[in-house]
């Protein structure tokens, strides 16, 4: 039996991706990232100073926070106030690690960039959309620092994007939506640069095991998606 995608896409086809830049007024960088029906507001704020372990090193820092808004899913999500769920902590650390890899932190100087990823609507892929859209907001934020003369040049080293790949009925599919995400035997999240150098691979075999040849197929499919996402980032930043 072959899995039929609910939205009619081909196995190697991304959902429509859009980046709406300068979506809010006050943040140094702000992007509404849309991946199909998943919508994430990504903002980047600049704060003076760095964590204590980086003080007097001349090096900057980037950290991330991730939340799902109450109306982002069919059933209302409770706000995480006093204590974050393990899932939320895992995702915001992933976003932070991924976007730090895009930066020359020494060139940033002793300041902190805070990436906020707020999920307005969730149809799977919220963490990958947060990373891919967060990068666009990050570029806008550091360009603002350059234009204000606060740093001499952009500390961006390379593009970073992320995508999911799932195994359904034994076949790999790119960029899962929610029905596919819950039905996948294997779910993989891949973060990479425009040179297709891997920054992170998160994978779980929900049912049974994952043979190495199938993992290679999934990574090959992820590379196709990463290239397309980075091209979409370039087009958005050039507009």
From Swiss-Prot:
Domain of life: Bacteria
Record PROSITE patterns: RIBONUCLEASE_PH (PS01277)
GO molecular function: 3'-5'-RNA exonuclease activity; tRNA binding; tRNA nucleotidyltransferase activity
GO process terms (BP): rRNA catabolic process; rRNA processing; tRNA processing
Binding site for phosphate: 87, 125-127
Record has RNA-binding as a keyword: yes
Catalytic activity annotation: tRNA(n+1) + phosphate = tRNA(n) + a ribonucleoside 5'-diphosphate
EC number: 2.7.7.56
Keywords tagged on the record: Nucleotidyltransferase, RNA-binding, rRNA processing, Transferase, tRNA processing, tRNA-binding
Cited InterPro entries: ExoRNase_PH_dom1, ExoRNase_PH_dom2, ExoRNase_PH_dom2_sf, PNPase/RNase_PH_dom_sf, Ribosomal_Su5_D2-typ_SF, RNase_PH, RNase_PH_bac-type, RNase_PH_CS
Keyword RNA-binding: yes
NCBIfam families assigned: RNasePH
Family: Belongs to the RNase PH family.
Subunit structure: Homohexameric ring arranged as a trimer of dimers.
HAMAP family the record matches: RNase_PH (MF_00564)
Record's function text: Phosphorolytic 3'-5' exoribonuclease that plays an important role in tRNA 3'-end maturation. Removes nucleotide residues following the 3'-CCA terminus of tRNAs; can also add nucleotides to the ends of RNA molecules by using nucleoside diphosphates as substrates, but this may not be physiologically important. Probably plays a role in initiation of 16S rRNA degradation (leading to ribosome degradation) during starvation.
Protein name: Ribonuclease PH
Species this protein is from: Acaryochloris marina (strain MBIC 11017)
Name of the encoding gene: rph
